[in-house]
From Swiss-Prot:
Annotated SMART domains: CLIP (SM00680), Tryp_SPc (SM00020)
Gene Ontology annotations of biological process type: innate immune response; melanization defense response; proteolysis; response to fungus; Toll receptor ligand protein activation cascade
Domain Clip: 28-91
Record bears the keyword Glycoprotein: yes
This protein's name: Melanization protease 1
Functional description taken from the UniProt entry: Serine protease which plays an essential role in the melanization immune response by acting downstream of sp7 to activate prophenoloxidase (PPO1). May function in diverse Hayan-dependent PPO1-activating cascades that are negatively controlled by different serpin proteins; Spn27A in the hemolymph and Spn77BA in the trachea. Regulation of melanization and PPO1 activation appears to be largely independent of the Toll signaling pathway.
Annotated organism of origin: Drosophila melanogaster
Enzyme class: hydrolase
Amino acid sequence: MEPHFFFTVLWMLLMGTSSTYAQEIFGYCRTPDENSGTCINLRECGYLFELLQSEEVTEQDRRFLQASQCGYRNGQVLEKHFCFTNVQICCANSRMRNQQPQWGNHPQPTQTTKPTKRSGTKLLPMAPNCGENFGDRVVGGNETTKREFPWMALIEYTKPGNVKGHHCGGSLINHRYVLTAAHCVSAIPSDWELTGVRLGEWDASTNPDCTVGKNGRRDCNEPYVDYPVEERIPHPQYPGNSRDQLNDIALLRLRDEVQYSDFILPVCLPTLASQHNNIFLGRKVVVAGWGRTETNFTSNIKLKAELDTVPTSECNQRYATQRRTVTTKQMCAGGVEGVDSCRGDSGGPLLLEDYSNGNSNYYIAGVVSYGPTPCGLKGWPGVYTRVEAYLNWIENNVRA
């Protein structure tokens, strides 16, 4: 196809609509024919990209491609002023991958054989040996300090051409495991490989991360550390094709044991009796991250935002307009214009500072699952997988 004709067709496709059917929700979307999909770059959706390159694009094809656009980038709809490389398309998961992704000649991580019940309890740290936060308490600050939330992880994917990128987040929970969302593991394009986890990061544009204090002295973190992933363990009942994204939780087992430091530490799991069946109404929770999703990123520097939790009934009523159901295994927070999970990562943590035996520690109350697009819409809280509901599953799937 001649390049001029190709871009003419692309222009016609994207000029035809100002609102798209395929709304992105943290990378999850619905195609015009009601299949589940992932909002990714047009070039990475093989069958739609091939369709666009065809010299015989029918009117029906054109309408389907228009309706497939899920192109929000930094809160802007991609219409008249767009860069081709930024065009986002809702690519059907059924067309991107088989039931299990095929990684070419790369060895596939295997599923864990279910250990003896609650075999991992002793492997998971308890307060005060987790959830320690060394950052300065800056109320209302958007950016974290260098040592805040040292359990935060960036998940690395290797794409065609050996191109690497971080498109999800996670949380370190012990020396070998990172907790994340199942959609970050199971609902990715078939030609992406989840290859690693980065720990000890703060500013993704520098290494090591340094700041200059008021006294003029330069203070630096230790360099970040990249760990290969040995095994990926999505929840077995995660239905990737469901609007409700139930059981959206996964574990990543790292190949090597993580060495703790002031910059790399685990977060606490919500094991306190007071945290049982609790969505923490009236309590402040914190979402943190770089704003990384499967299709976009917000910041090089780790961000944070303080949110209020939202009653499940109220959240359910809101998402019923999108034919979604929020269950007791999920929780909702945010809905404040311009804040919400725009500062969090897909798969990243929703954090609660709690107290036990005189100790103040951070606990992971939720895992970022989905929310409105663009993020931070007034009255639309983000939906999180409620971690306490999955403690048995976590404990049964970690091993030494």
